[in-house]
């Protein structure tokens, strides 16, 4: 999937507000789109994330997105991470954060 890259960093979309997650509440096969897709990134960059709802997702990505919970869309932000990084979205009570895999925060057993 295409990603938005700026100055060697990739845009990662996530919702740091408590209450409802964004990609963390979606089915696994839909998460990559919700995290990286340029259409979503551009909505955030244009301060239009509040316009993202179920119908917007269906119109842009298809029927399989009609059950994505969009309650967290109004809190969407972008974290720019180094291109090629392994990332995952962590979630607690709807609050999402971006975790970047590196040798500083992972240990081998």
What are these regions (language model features)?
Residues 1-109:
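Catalytic phosphate/metal-binding cores of nucleic-acid and nucleotide-processing enzymes, i.e., regions
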């Amino acid at each position: 999937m295409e990603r938005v890259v700026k100055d060697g960093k990739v845009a990662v979309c996530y919702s740091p507000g408590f209450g409802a997650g964004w990609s963390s509440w979606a089915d696994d096969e839909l998460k990559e789109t919700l995290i990286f897709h340029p259409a979503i990134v551009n909505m955030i960059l244009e301060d239009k994330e509040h316009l993202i709802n179920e119908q917007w997702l269906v119109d842009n990505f298809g029927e399989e997105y009609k059950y994505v919970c969009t309650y967290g869309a109004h809190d969407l932000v972008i974290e720019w991470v180094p291109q090629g990084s392994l990332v995952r979205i962590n979630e607690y009570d709807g609050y999402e954060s971006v975790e970047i895999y590196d040798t500083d925060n992972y240990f081998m057993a």
